[in-house]
Swiss-Prot record:
GO CC annotation terms, alphabetical: cytoplasm; small ribosomal subunit
Gene Ontology MF: a single term: structural constituent of ribosome
Keywords: Ribonucleoprotein, Ribosomal protein, RNA-binding, rRNA-binding
Free-text function comment from the UniProt entry: Protein S19 forms a complex with S13 that binds strongly to the 16S ribosomal RNA.
Lineage, uppermost ranks: Bacteria, Pseudomonadati, Pseudomonadota, Gammaproteobacteria, Pseudomonadales
InterPro entries: Ribosomal_uS19, Ribosomal_uS19_bac-type, Ribosomal_uS19_CS, Ribosomal_uS19_SF
Protein's UniProt name: Small ribosomal subunit protein uS19
Annotated organism of origin: Pseudomonas aeruginosa (strain ATCC 15692 / DSM 22644 / CIP 104116 / JCM 14847 / LMG 12228 / 1C / PRS 101 / PAO1)
Pfam families: Ribosomal_S19
NCBIfam families documented for this protein: rpsS_bact
UniProt-listed GO biological process terms: ribosomal small subunit assembly; translation
HAMAP family in the record: Ribosomal_uS19
Length: 91
C-alpha cells in the first residue's frame, strides 16, 4: 500500500544531505548508500547513486521516470541462474 500523501515521501536524512551537497557542488561522483527504502525525489535526477544490494553497490543513474519509486527497486538482490537442465533431454 502506498504512503499517505499527507506524510510526504520518505528519504533518509543522511542521503538527503549527500544529495543536496552533490546538487549544490554539481558533483557527478556516485553517492554510495545502503538506504534502499528511500524514495527518489525530483532533484535527484541526473545523479548516480550506488545502491547496496547485499553484496556490492550497484550504480543507478536516476532519470525522470524513476521519480516516486524506491532506490531498492533498481538494485536486484537475487540472481536467477535458471532451473537445472534435464540430463535426459540433453541426449
Amino acid at each position: 500500500m502506498p504512503r499517505s500523501l499527507k506524510k510526504g515521501p520518505f528519504i533518509d536524512l543522511h542521503l538527503l544531505k549527500k544529495v543536496e551537497v552533490a546538487v549544490e557542488k554539481n558533483d557527478r561522483k556516485p553517492i554510495k548508500t545502503w538506504s534502499r527504502r528511500s524514495m527518489i525525489l525530483p532533484h535527484m535526477v541526473g545523479l548516480t547513486i550506488a545502491v547496496h544490494n547485499g553484496r556490492q553497490h550497484v550504480p543507478v543513474l536516476v532519470n525522470e521516470d524513476m521519480v516516486g519509486h524506491k532506490l531498492g527497486e533498481f538494485a536486484a538482490t537475487r540472481t536467477y541462474r535458471g532451473h537445472a537442465a534435464d540430463k535426459k533431454a540433453k541426449r
